[in-house]
Amino acid sequence: MRSAIAAPILFLLVSFFVQECESVGFAPELYCGLENCYDVLEVNREEFDKQKLAKAYRALARKHHPDRVKNKEEKLLAEERFRVIATAYETLKDDEAKTNYDYYLDHPDQRFYNYYQYYRLRAAPKVDLRIVIVGTILIISLFQFLSAKHKFSEAIEYATGVGKFRNMAIKDGIDKGLLEMDRNGKLKKNKGVDNDEVIKQIIIDNLDVTGGYKRESIYDTLAWHTIIFPLTIFRYIKWTALWYWRFAIQKEEYDDDAKLYLIRKYIGVSQMEFDQKYTDEDIDDLFERECWLKRNCATWKAERDAAEQEKMAQSGRYKRYKRYMKNAGTISFVDED
């Protein structure tokens, strides 16, 4: 009697255990469901070869293709089988997917990790990250180039309308025989010659536009700086090592280039900004006051800033600007006052 009761209980326990093992080993919604993808394609995991994989897939795809079945119910079964075969092939032909699947087979207990890897790979875009990076750099570089071109055109249009630059261009054009004056002192309108375009081209050739409105160049784009980045790093390391060797170890005295570097560093400007902003007289003053020493440079900079503030405060234009800003206005780049 006791054995008759124990047998059904044992059967239920074993059945429950088998179901639990199945649920831990394979998840219906992952990969090939409750089947092993290797078994689906009839390939040996230990002797895996992509050429054999492709061959096995083509053979099974032909055998189980839904178009070969006419019966409606059998066609549905064939479609389901064909889907499993295709899923198995897509899983094993991709290196990353195969690695994740092998881990899934070897570590069935790590359910959450296996789910994450499966859906992460499915959700990830099938695009080479290198292509995305290169494409992004090129788009940014194109935008930089076109923006610089537009700003340079704005600067030239502005300069063309300024009397001083226009008169200088007209004089230069007359000297070169590109423009002619009539008896009344006005420019002749020769056939086939656009005087305004000639003047504009002369201004472009002779005007030195710097800063944010300088002429566009590929050498100012992100793409170019990315290309020369290794060389830039090498030069920086070489320069730093040489500086340390000369002035920290050898205790050499600073030459003029080293002094100028320290001055720019303490003022807080780049070499291009320094060349644009400071005259030869300013540089002589900086050297005379030994501004390569940090404390001297700080004193000089404070005096310079105070003098500029006072000069601006006394300027009628600056006062108009302050009143304008007080009234919540904005100021444009071009101001001909």
UniProtKB/Swiss-Prot annotation:
Species of origin: Caenorhabditis elegans
Compartment(s) where it occurs, according to its Swiss-Prot or TrEMBL record: Membrane
SMART domains tied to this protein: DnaJ (SM00271)
Keywords, comma-separated and alphabetical: Chaperone, Coiled coil, Membrane, Transmembrane, Transmembrane helix
InterPro entries: DnaJ_domain, DnaJ_domain_CS, DNAJC25-like, J_dom_sf
Gene Ontology, cellular component aspect: endoplasmic reticulum membrane
J domain sequence ranges: 36-105
TM ranges: 4-24, 127-147, 222-242
Protein name: DnaJ homolog dnj-2
Keyword hit for Membrane: yes
Main localization of the protein described in the UniProt heading: membrane
Family: Belongs to the DNAJC25 family.
Membrane topology category: Multi-pass membrane protein
SUPFAM superfamilies: Chaperone J-domain
Cystine pairs: none
UniProt-listed Pfam families: DnaJ (PF00226)
GO annotation (BP), single: protein folding
Coiled-coil region(s): 293-323
